[in-house]
Regions:
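Cys/His-rich microdomains that often coordinate metals
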Residues: 21, 41, 81
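Short cysteine-rich clusters marking metal-coordination/redox-active sites
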Residues: 14-17, 34-37
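Short pre-active-site segment immediately N-terminal to redox-active cysteine/selenocysteine motifs
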Residues: 62-65, 69-73, 115
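Short Cys/His-rich micro-motifs in 6-15 aa windows
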Residues: 38-46
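Non-catalytic, surface beta->alpha helical segment in thiol-disulfide oxidoreductase systems
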Residues: 115, 120-149
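A short beta-strand-turn-helix
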Residues: 46-64
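Short linker/helix segments within small regulatory modules
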Residues: 23-32
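Thiol-based oxidoreductase modules, predominantly thioredoxin-like and allied folds used
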Residues: 49, 69, 80, 84-106, ...
Length: 149
């Protein structure tokens, strides 16, 4: 799913049907659903964030944000992607986000991303912890439990 900020709204591509939806910034924490397929916009699948909207989403989200910094050329990143997507489906209480480090160098630099994949957990806009490397499903669950619960 891709999120793009437009004035006080964000354009969000549905992670299920890929139709673009306009969501008011103040509704980021509501159970916003796709106008086309009716499925949740912010639960069940990772949300693609960019340099343009990363800070806005972190500031507006009342849910903890789990960010995966990755790149398309990175083999371990590609291998970890299904594990991350499955975790997003299991944990609607968190906002799972993906940031392509090649397409978004500014936020990658601000977050001091030195290796990929790197996961960073945020609560109320503040980084709580980070871990680098492709994790198994069990390792990811253990890390989430230790950091966010």
């Amino acid at each position: 799913m891709t999120v793009k900020r437009v004035e006080s709204a964000m354009i969000v591509s549905c992670p299920h049907c890929h139709i673009r939806n306009r969501v008011q910034s103040e509704r980021l924490n509501d159970e916003a659903s796709c106008g086309s397929c009716g499925r949740p916009l912010f639960a069940g699948a990772p949300t693609a964030l960019s340099d343009a909207n990363f800070a806005d989403v972190l500031a507006a989200s009342r849910r903890p944000v789990v960010a995966d910094f990755w790149a398309a050329w990175c083999g371990p990143c590609r291998g970890f992607a299904p594990v991350f997507a499955q975790a997003a489906a299991r944990h609607p209480e968190y906002l799972f986000a993906k940031i392509d480090t090649d397409a978004n160098p500014q936020i990658s630099q601000q977050q001091s991303i030195r290796s990929i994949p790197t996961l960073v957990a945020f609560r109320q806009g503040q980084a709580l912890d980070r871990i680098s490397g492709a994790l198994s499903a069990g390792q990811l669950e253990d890390w989430l439990a230790g950091v966010l619960r």
